[in-house]
């Protein structure tokens, strides 16, 4: 009799797991937003679908109930709720209402991410790589040589930030032109320019921007994020249009 009860309990737990979902809120109730993104990423890596609820509780996520996912949330301090089918249907119905500015977007693939940044920088020197490292989301650092060698076709997502694409090296010239790190960066850029047949750093940077433009124009399913005001303006000028999104 005890054996039958035990088997029945396991079957019931399995049925509940299949029926329920995990809601990861991204509003002020969330205790660790960056780690939450990491949980979502690793859920996608396992081949599971995720629903991104735009404008619902800060852009929350719905994950299939998965024991490993639940454990990951607990270990990483990510706030979550286990919700039954009725609650999920109510949330989706609320989002679908024409009176509500919200939507549910299905996520099916964990993107392969590249961050445009000098190789000599450490993850903690850069806000983007620091955030991705903390969230435990894998990424590759790429720079001018990799882009000109055609690496972009390997990635779904390219992040650009704090880059002066004019190649004038004037962003820190006044205060830092005598610093060793500034001189080393200038020397490296000049060497890279010569490697690809350019006489000036500005020509190198223009070629990099145009390579990114061609990559996006070819219809690759990627997103390009730009986070530097001046760099964005020059990037847009070379694109001839708003090819990226300015954050």
Enumerate the predicted regions with their spans.
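Aromatic-Pro/Gly-enriched surface loop or interdomain linker
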Residues: 30, 35-39, 45-49, 56-65, ...
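Anion (oxyanion) recognition and catalysis
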Residues: 44-45, 74, 133, 216-217
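Sec-dependent N-terminal signal peptides
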Residues: 4-15
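Stable alpha-helical elements in mature extracytoplasmic
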Residues: 36, 69, 124, 128, ...
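Structural motif
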Residues: 23-25, 157-162, 223
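Short amphipathic alpha-helices in soluble, non-transmembrane regions
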Residues: 69-82
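A glycine-rich, often tryptophan-bearing local segment used as a flexible ligand/cofactor-contacting loop or short
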Residues: 170-247
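Boundary at the C-terminal end of the N-terminal hydrophobic targeting segment
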Residues: 16-21
């Amino acid at each position: 009799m005890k054996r039958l009860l035990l088997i029945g309990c396991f079957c019931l737990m399995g049925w509940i797991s299949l029926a329920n979902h995990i809601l990861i809120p991204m509003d002020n109730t969330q205790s660790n937003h960056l780690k939450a993104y990491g949980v979502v990423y690793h859920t996608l890596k396992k081949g599971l679908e995720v629903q991104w609820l735009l404008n619902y509780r800060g852009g929350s996520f719905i994950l299939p109930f998965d024991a490993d996912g639940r454990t990951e949330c607990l270990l990483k301090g990510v706030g979550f709720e286990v919700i039954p089918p009725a609650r999920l249907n109510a949330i989706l119905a609320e989002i679908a209402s024409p009176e509500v500015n919200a939507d549910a977007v299905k996520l099916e693939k964990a993107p392969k991410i590249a961050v445009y940044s000098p190789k000599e920088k450490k993850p903690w020197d850069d806000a983007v790589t620091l955030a991705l490292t903390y969230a435990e989301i894998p990424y590759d650092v790429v720079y001018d040589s990799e882009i000109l060698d055609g690496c972009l076709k390997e990635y779904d997502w390219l992040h650009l930030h704090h880059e002066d694409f004019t190649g004038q090296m004037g962003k820190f010239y006044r205060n830092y032109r005598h610093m060793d790190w500034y001189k080393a960066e200038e020397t490296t850029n000049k060497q890279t320019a010569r490697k690809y047949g350019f006489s000036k750093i500005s020509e190198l940077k223009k070629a990099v921007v145009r390579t990114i433009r061609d990559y996006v124009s070819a219809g690759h399913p990627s997103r390009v994020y730009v986070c530097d005001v001046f760099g964005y303006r020059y990037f847009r000028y070379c694109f001839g249009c708003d090819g990226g999104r300015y954050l």
